[in-house]
Every structure is written in C-alpha cells, then in structure tokens.
Amino acid sequence: MQNEEGQVTELYIPRKCSATNRLITSKDHASVQLNIGHLDANGLYTGQFTTFALCGFVRAQGDADSGVDRLWQKKKVEAKQN
C-alpha cells in the first residue's frame, strides 16, 4: 500500500531467502539479513555493500556459511562479466 506521496506504508514487506529462494515469513525469527561490504585492492571499505537474506531453515541445517560463500562467488562472477 502506498500513500499520496508514493511511499510504501506497509509494516511487513516479505523477503526471499537468497540461498534457497524460499519466502521468509513474518514468523521466521531465525532469519537474518547480512550486508557484506565491498573492499578495494588495498583492503579498504569502499562504501558499497551487497545484501543477502538467509531463512531460518538454511541456518538450522548449518548451510548458512556455504550458502553465503556460494552467493558471494556467484556475485563476483556476475560483476566480472559486466
């Protein structure tokens, strides 16, 4: 729902898990959102970041670390192609 200025006024905006593409429900209290900062060649933060959302199911299975690693490798390949 939007107000007259076009701003979103919803209290809950559903997200999807970046690793499994599952819908993260409002009752999934184990889900997390990670912002991973981008570094330059000297290892300094550039001010940019990439956001990944992980559902509680992935975290409960112990696949969060490998899922984030896989997503980050995919992101690096996409960045090199552009």
Swiss-Prot record:
GO annotation (BP), single: translation
Keyword annotations from UniProtKB, A to Z: Acetylation, Ribonucleoprotein, Ribosomal protein
N-acetylmethionine: modified positions: M1
Gene3D superfamilies tied to this protein: 3.30.1230.20
InterPro entries registered for this protein in UniProt: Ribosomal_eS21 (IPR001931), Ribosomal_eS21_CS (IPR018279), Ribosomal_eS21_sf (IPR038579)
Entries under PROSITE patterns matching the protein: RIBOSOMAL_S21E
GO molecular function, one term: structural constituent of ribosome
Pfam families membership: Ribosomal_S21e
Family the entry assigns: Belongs to the eukaryotic ribosomal protein eS21 family.
PANTHER family on file: 40S RIBOSOMAL PROTEIN S21 (PTHR10442)
Protein name: Small ribosomal subunit protein eS21y
The organism's taxonomic lineage, starting at the top: Eukaryota, Viridiplantae, Streptophyta, Embryophyta, Tracheophyta
